[in-house]
Design a protein with these regions (language model features):
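Helix-to-loop junction immediately C-terminal to a conserved catalytic motif
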Residues: 60
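Short coil-to-helix segment of the ABC ATPase nucleotide-binding domain corresponding to the Q-loop/switch region
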Residues: 97-105
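The feature captures the beta-strand-to-loop junction immediately N-terminal to the Walker
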Residues: 45-47
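Conserved ABC transporter NBD signature motif
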Residues: 68-80
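Conserved signature/switch motifs of ABC ATPase nucleotide-binding domains
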Residues: 136-139, 157
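Catalytic Walker B motif of ABC-type/P-loop ATPase nucleotide-binding domains
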Residues: 162-165
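Conserved ABC ATPase "signature" region
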Residues: 104, 108, 115-133, 185
Length: 263
């Protein structure tokens, strides 16, 4: 079942974003409102160009909104946030630092106690199957391993909220499945709120408590679907009738909006 304390950690209120271009203004987001409650896993699912990543960057305080507000713990976000972890599609590791040292980069930037931070970093690497790879450099790691290092780096300071921008997009199907399982365990153990951008319908249903379905540009919320599947979830849940029903419900929304076309 979904984890929901009833209190919104993150509230996005009437958010719009308009970019100025040589051809005139382009509206990327149009009056988007949603809440992510404490401990929830919320996925944002939609077609390319619908403003999913822009929404995440505004929630992180990295991009200003044209109108509307992002409220975190009752306070309006007006600058880049330091209370979160963030993971991008590309791991962005430093080639000259080992896996452990890349994770520790977050701790160094925040001036955390090195001994305690290193213990956390090693535990995180162990929890995602990278025990024995702590001293390997990025070029010695597979794409999936590098992304695991990136996730560990985002968590070493123990944030209460994790923002993820298509973190599995460049990975093969089997690696995506394994990292999804790893992420589910990390989320469950830490009881953090996750805002997860993805193109994958199956990924969204498997991981989420709520799936926010976006329309094509300008990005609006088409529907918010609560996913009531037992936790912890195994890959076998994808074979159930309930999983298929959620997938069909979302697919029908994309057919109705013209994102998908049949015949």
């Amino acid at each position: 079942m979904s984890r929901d304390s009833g209190q919104a950690l993150l509230s996005i209120q009437g958010l719009s974003k308009v970019y100025a271009t040589l051809d005139g203004p382009v509206r990327a987001l149009d009056h988007v409102s949603l809440d992510a409650r404490r401990g929830q896993f919320v996925s944002i699912l939609g077609p390319s160009g619908c403003g999913k990543s822009t929404l995440l960057m505004i929630a992180a305080g990295l991009v200003p909104a044209s109108s509307g507000a992002v409220i975190v713990n009752g306070e309006r976000v007006a600058r880049p946030r330091t209370d979160i972890g963030i993971v991008f599609q590309n791991p962005v590791l430093l080639d000259w630092r080992t896996a452990l040292d890349n994770v520790m980069l977050q701790a160094e930037a925040r001036k955390l106690d090195r001994g305690a931070a290193e213990r956390k970093a090693r535990q995180l690497l162990f929890s995602v199957g990278l025990e024995g790879f702590e001293n390997k450099y990025p070029h010695e790691l597979s794409g999936g391993m590098r992304q695991r290092v990136s996730i560990c780096r985002a968590l070493v300071h123990e944030p209460h909220q994790l923002l993820m921008d298509e973190p599995f997009g460049a990975l093969d199907a089997l690696t995506r499945d394994q990292i999804a399982l790893d992420l589910q365990k990390l989320w469950n153990d830490r009881q953090m709120t996750v805002l997860f951008v993805t193109h994958s319908l199956a990924e969204a249903v498997f991981l989420s408590d709520r799936v926010v379905v976006m329309t094509p540009r300008p990005g609006r919320i088409d529907s918010i679907i609560d996913i009531d599947l037992p936790r912890p979830r195994t890959l076998a849940v994808r074979d159930t009738a309930q999983f298929a029903a959620y997938s069909r419900q979302i697919r029908d929304l994309f057919l109705a909006s013209g994102v998908l076309r049949e015949g």
